[in-house]
Amino acid sequence: MAKSKNHTAHNQSAKAHKNGIKKPRRHRHTPTRGMDPKFLRNQRYARKHNVKAGENASAEE
């Protein structure tokens, strides 16, 4: 008996492109569940101190 074929990529690209390969929908707030906690902590501090130059100028005067 002949050996059977183990794998082929024939027609897979055509099947994938039939309905188009779409990028995932980008949401306003991407979920952070399962992300690195150290990165998330740093991101929180970065967001807290991300202030534009002219925003707090009127409050100081």
From Swiss-Prot:
Residues 15-31 have a biased composition (Basic residues). Residues 1-61 are annotated as: Disordered. Pfam families: Ribosomal_L29e (PF01779). GO terms for cellular component: cytosolic large ribosomal subunit; nucleolus. One of its GO terms (biological process) is translation. The modification Phosphoserine is found at residue 58. The keyword RNA-binding does not apply. It comes from the Eukaryota. Keywords: Phosphoprotein, Ribonucleoprotein, Ribosomal protein. InterPro entries: Ribosomal_eL29. One of its GO terms (molecular function) is structural constituent of ribosome. Belongs to the eukaryotic ribosomal protein eL29 family. PANTHER family: 60S RIBOSOMAL PROTEIN L29 (PTHR12884), LARGE RIBOSOMAL SUBUNIT PROTEIN EL29Y-RELATED (PTHR12884:SF39). This is Large ribosomal subunit protein eL29z. It comes from Arabidopsis thaliana (Mouse-ear cress).
